[in-house]
Amino acid sequence: MSQLVVTGANGFVGRAVCRRALDAGYTVTALVRRPGGCIDGVREWVHDGGDFDGLGERWPAGLRADAVIHLAARVHVMRDESPDPDAAFDAINVAGTLRLAKAAHRHGVRRIVYASSIKAVGERDGGVPLSETASPDPQDAYGRSKLRAERLLQQFGAANGLDVVVVRPPLVYGPTVRANFLRMMDAVARGMPLPLGSIPARRSIVYVDNLADALLRCATDPRAVGECFHVADDDAPSVTGLLRLVGDALGKPARLIAVPSVVLRGLGALTGRRAAIDRLTDSLQLDTGRITRVLGWHPPYTTREGLEATAAWYRSRNTQQ
């Protein structure tokens, strides 16, 4: 295999996937909505519109890709103001994914790797790390859209001879990370007291270069065909442990105050932040044994190595501002 298409290639995960693919000798076409932001060395293909309408008619002449790694999505947001969140997510994450699959199949692509999310399964593990056989129970519109896209994509692939691989990551971190993980780093770096010093809940996370490595393996390994894989770092730290690791990486110990989980949940209910607190106090561990058994894949980086790389970026970012 030599030709890959990566959607969302100018995003956080997309840049990491493209970098790893180029380093491995692949030719990469970056399918993006807006120009700019891609790494050097890729062929940029701008298609305005996240729903991929008309993609088949605008497929570049001469592009004969072997696989598509599909990262583009309407992403999860904490306070979605759409009048119909399910419809808004489905328009991009479900209908758009199917349009992409149809266009890719029409133009000879043999495999699509779909970057789903553990949110397609749920928000907590119930005391047992979530495997690929766990009964899905998505809790929000984003998770529901990801699950629907998985199922419809698998049906389309089975009916049309398109190889489909689904990858479900948890929270992704690494250099250029944004949103909640960056806010957490800001809080630790500024020495803010955090009431999370006694949270035993364990949360799987994945370093962006580990995820990129797994996605590329799924695009190229024949044993991945038809599979669904949970992908995460090897260790799932407790919430308290993660904050300490972040502090170590930043060279600034996290200021942690021991507040029982039950108290935090009560405060969350009183302040209207129940969902956010539940995500901190409930465990969400992934069972990643399947990708190891089927593909022999292991994360190339430890969580500590990933956090050190993220902290190095964070420090350089602050010196450049």
Predicted feature locations:
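Mid/C-terminal beta-alpha module of Rossmann-like enzyme folds, strongest
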Residues: 217-275, 304, 308-311
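Active-site Tyr-X1-5-Lys
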Residues: 137-165
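Conserved Rossmann-fold NAD(P)-dependent oxidoreductase catalytic core, especially the SDR/UDP-sugar
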Residues: 98-141
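Glycine-rich Rossmann NAD(P)(H)-binding loop
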Residues: 174, 196-201, 229-236, 245-251, ...
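Substrate-positioning beta->alpha
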Residues: 99, 177-183, 197-219, 226-227
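N-terminal Rossmann NAD(P)H-binding glycine-rich loop of SDR-like oxidoreductase domains
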Residues: 4-24
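NAD(P)H-binding glycine-rich loop region in Rossmannoid oxidoreductase-like domains
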Residues: 47-94, 99, 103-106, 121
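Conserved C-terminal active-site "lid" loop/helix of NAD(P)H-dependent oxidoreductases
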Residues: 208, 241-244, 267-298, 309
